[in-house]
Amino acid sequence: MGSPSEISQRIEVIKRRDEFERDPLTFLRKWRRKDITVQKKIIHAKNTLDNIQLDDSILSKCAEICIAVGSDGLRGELTLLRALRALCAFNETTKPTLEDIRKIAVYTLSHRLRRDPLDDTSSEVRVKRKVNELIDDK
């Protein structure tokens, strides 16, 4: 993941970081309740991972995307499927959708691409492009 590209998000990150640096204890107290809420949500998601169902259409789309982006081996698909399960569990849904694949693919696949010395396009952009083509094409 990189830095946010939206100005408002960047400003918020900068403000929070500055707030932490000026007074770490107050900052930690301020965010403690939110941290606990997120922690509970993560624990709940971890406990429901086995309930996430991956049907053949999702498996097929993941394989299609991995082939299209040139991901080496099968680890791309396996990583993408694990991430889809985690996303669904965190969002309290039981079946991943094509939109879930669109959200998560760039994070799981961009570092798995073979390098093309003649293509200066970033791997993130290449993955996004292929995912959008394949999902929008259905």
Residue ranges and their predicted role:
Residues 1-69:
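Phosphate-sensing "switch" segment of ASCE/P-loop ATPases
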Residues 63-76, 86-138:
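C-terminal engagement/docking regions of AAA+ P-loop ATPases
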